[in-house]
A protein has these predicted regions:
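Short, acidic/polar
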Residues: 11-22, 84-93, 180-184
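Catalytic domains of carbohydrate-active enzymes, especially glycoside hydrolases
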Residues: 18-35
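Conserved small/polar residues in nucleotide/adenosyl-binding loops
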Residues: 263-266
């Protein structure tokens, strides 16, 4: 299991600085949240590559800043906008292929959108197939304010797209959607390719690992059932932790919980 941290946790710190802060704290596995299109080229990309190489980091995934644009652009009814965003995402795939990142996180259309399901599936499939050419998997994330917050919608994606759909399961987003994450894992099964993890309790849905009451032992048990051996990325909001050191501690805590759970499962 590759356990790490997302640079999104350090927002609004610039992406390369966020990556450096994690690297300095011994975090080896990361998700890079790209906050500007110019971070995929020029000196920023050079610096990202330098940090990755110098610290021996493993970039598991990328998350685009343009998620809020996906409703209007990727899934909208104006072809030029669709082509524009697909072209931008193609650049992500190129960079991901260069640095070895395998999963591209997609939010998709918001709940209030009137995007027909047929169009949604067609556009997702197009992006999925394009990414595959670069060795990248486009994975639909469950987001509380998006169509993917609905278990029914996720079931429809699986039913209509078959083996050409994959998913990111985010624990805090499941809490915010009032969806049991264990039920979600059971429904999606081996099509889960990425996890965003956080702790939580009745008072807060996003806490550092070990600061809430979430049953991580059960999580590992459920993941064992679907033979999940991929990434587990800590993703917290800046107001939910006290220091950058706490992010590294979260990753280490997850590793300890996993080690204990794995021993019991075996």
């Amino acid at each position: 299991m590759d356990i790490g941290v997302s640079t999104a946790c350090l927002y609004p710190l610039e992406t390369e600085k966020a990556l450096y802060e994690l690297a300095e704290r011994g975090v080896k596995n990361v998700e890079i949240f790209v906050n500007s299109i110019d971070e995929l080229e020029g000196q920023v990309l050079v610096e990202l590559r330098r940090i990755i190489g110098e610290y021996g980091m493993n970039v598991l995934s990328m998350h685009p800043f343009s998620s809020p644009m996906e409703t209007l652009f990727l899934f909208g009814d104006y072809p030029r906008r669709t082509e524009y965003l697909i072209d931008i995402y193609k650049r992500y795939f190129e960079v991901m292929a260069e640095i070895g990142a395998g999963v591209f996180v997609l939010h998709g259309a918001i709940l209030s959108s009137k995007v027909p399901d047929e169009r949604y599936m067609e556009r997702y499939l197009r992006l999925f197939r394009l990414a595959k050419e670069f060795g990248v998997t486009v994975a639909q994330e469950n987001i509380c304010y998006c169509k993917s917050s609905s278990v029914r919608f996720i079931e429809d994606m699986i039913g209509q797209l078959g083996d050409e759909v994959r998913f990111v399961v985010d624990l805090k987003q499941a809490r915010r959607s009032n969806v049991d994450p264990f039920r979600l894992l059971d429904i999606i099964g081996d099509k889960v390719v990425h996890l965003h993890v956080s702790d939580g309790d009745a008072g807060c849905d996003c806490l550092p690992i070990g600061k809430g009451s979430f049953n991580f032992n059960r999580l590992f048990s459920e993941l064992e059932k679907i033979n999940y051996d991929k990434a587990m990325i800590v993703e917290l909001y800046r107001e939910n932790y006290s220091s950058y050191d706490e992010l590294a501690a979260c990753a280490n805590n997850m590793k300890k919980i996993y080690a204990v759970s794995y021993t019991h499962l075996r």
